[in-house]
């Protein structure tokens, strides 16, 4: 096994060395990056905090927070499509794509590709359970099995987050918080993300004062001003504070926070912008300003709609508001879009549930 250490933005990751696969087992692939052109070469090693890739004889160590996706030259097309679906929050589609992989397509593939199929299967099963609230035990088994077998995967942080979501769904909030511990040993962006996720556990329990305090702590964490990944996570944490303020009957404070996040976000921060307009819609509903809320949710539906969870939430609220506003045709259109496009989300399940359940 090879011992490696990755360096993030000029600073060494605190004493966190990682064991990776044999250096000789190189797999042709490409790193799709968040804010830079992609990198093609031979993938030498992966770990929770980065990927090492050989580009024409030059080794590059790329930090995990700057990587959007890792693709492999020899992977089946359906495997690639399934991973894209997982990344887009579409686990049902991912499972359909996985089913299209012919057994022969995986014969003789490199170990990283075989491992990737295991990841996509576990992420799809776990993601579907977390989104729908159904088959939680199967989701937990899949995710825990994958993490236990692949503790040095570059997908570790994402899978630990998914594990936390599943445990939260089971009402095991202390275990969910513990599942986020590996992120605390990661780069700053993931430490902020873990802190915000723990705040979310309080939010799920309707402990809004506690949640607001923890979200605020995450948003105020000390990070490098040039660390754009951490900045995005801190803006997301601020939106958590805004949602808590709405739940606590302080919509004006929530609006002020959302306005600040919107001003700090770039036009390409579509996920943050979608979450921000949903939070704005929440604040407007809390203030009794239903028409303003509709405008906020429509902004997510029509403009900042790339993140499925954001758009599903917006559609759910539009159904409720248009039903309330005596616009049955619009409500039905939004209802059908939600049920057809995002049938496995908690928002679709809430919509289909009997009133008062």
Where are the regions a protein language model picked out?
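Alpha-helical adaptor scaffolds
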Residues: 126-127, 131, 234-311
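Register position in tetratricopeptide repeats
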Residues: 87, 127, 169, 204-205, ...
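Compositionally biased alpha-helical segments
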Residues: 24-174, 185, 196, 204, ...
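Bacterial N-terminal signal peptides
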Residues: 9-21
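TPR/TPR-like (Sel1-like) alpha-helical repeat modules
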Residues: 295-302, 319, 323-346
